[in-house]
């Protein structure tokens, strides 16, 4: 299963999880979802099998999709856009330089990326203005999981 892994040294990775249920002391968190959409820079050959990539509103093929990947330097890459298939999302991340990538949320109700406390910001802001959920989404109880990315101090 595709897994976003955060390690105690501050690094992150996206990889196929093949380890035991207990990941060990080096792992700070792990977020799993479906198979990898990119591995070794190559598209998953099953990207055209719509049933593998989540249920869409109204059985639409092209919907809001988000994904995350890592490049050769270990940098984290995020992509989100409307009107995407699993394959087109994988292509976006591949062209951005991802070697490994996974799909995150799909459908307009769930794809969310908000900035909190950005330098000079007076309030939270959305990555893309067409993302439907409010910027306060994760500042109050929510029925979906989420994770946060913080900048390293002094870096």
PLM feature segments, named:
Residues 1-155:
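Gly/Ser/Thr/Pro-rich low-complexity, intrinsically disordered segments
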């Amino acid at each position: 299963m595709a897994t976003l892994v955060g390690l105690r040294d501050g690094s992150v990775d996206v990889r196929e999880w093949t380890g035991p249920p207990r990941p060990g002391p080096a792992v700070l968190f792990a977020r799993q979802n479906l198979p990898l959409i990119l591995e070794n820079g190559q598209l998953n050959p099953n990207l055209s099998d719509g049933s593998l990539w989540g249920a869409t509103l109204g059985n639409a093929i092209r919907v809001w999709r988000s994904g995350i990947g890592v490049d050769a330097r270990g940098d984290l890459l995020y992509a989100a856009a409307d009107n995407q298939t699993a394959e087109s999302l994988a292509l976006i991340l591949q062209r951005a330089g991802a070697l490994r990538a996974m799909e995150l949320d799909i459908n307009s109700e769930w794809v969310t990326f908000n900035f909190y406390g950005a330098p000079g910001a007076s309030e939270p802001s959305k990555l893309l203005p067409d993302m439907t959920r409010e910027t306060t989404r994760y500042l109050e109880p929510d029925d979906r999981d989420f994770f946060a990315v913080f900048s390293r101090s002094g870096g």
